[in-house]
A protein has these predicted regions:
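"…together with the soluble PPM/PP2C metallo-phosphatase catalytic core" -> "…together
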Residues: 1-147
Length: 147
């Protein structure tokens, strides 16, 4: 869902309100998948929704600088790969495919003298943000540790 809305936003600009509503709905669906919507402390879920939607938009804003989206994504994916070997919180193929995808993107985005061949756009940066947030959420749930 979020990929489709972001794709449309890349083709023709959507109002911020439409994008934010779609992002919140997608995050609620992710929280449902993570099975954290039943928490008795509803305010924690609301705060987590705001933080996660904000984090996904921060990654989207970084896409305009060559290599920064890929660099930050890899700096999260490599530790997640190592932690997954120990805790097994997601299927390892999800991390491997995500890492390889970001590495290929990095090849075209990180170029000398600011001449990037491509950018992720909204569809790429928001999608990778949601994938990273999903994996981090699974890790937090598996280890019950937020630090």
């Amino acid at each position: 869902m979020i990929g489709g809305v972001s794709f449309i936003d890349d083709i023709r600009s959507l109002p911020d309100s439409v994008r934010l509503i779609a992002q919140f709905i997608a995050m609620v669906m992710m929280f449902y998948q993570l099975d954290i919507l039943h928490l008795n402390m509803w305010w924690v879920v609301v705060l987590a929704l705001i933080v996660c939607v904000g984090a996904s938009n921060i990654i989207n804003f970084m896409d305009g600088i060559n290599g920064i989206t890929a660099g930050y994504s890899l700096s999260v994916l490599f530790p997640l790969m190592l932690l997954n070997e120990k805790f097994g919180f997601v299927d390892s193929s999800l991390i491997y495919v995500s890492t390889l995808s970001v590495l290929v993107f990095c090849f075209f985005n990180l170029r000398p003298k600011g001449k990037a061949k491509c950018f992720a756009g909204d569809v790429g940066s928001i999608s990778i943000a949601y994938i990273l947030l999903f994996m981090i959420g699974k890790l937090i749930i598996k280890t019950t540790d937020m630090t």
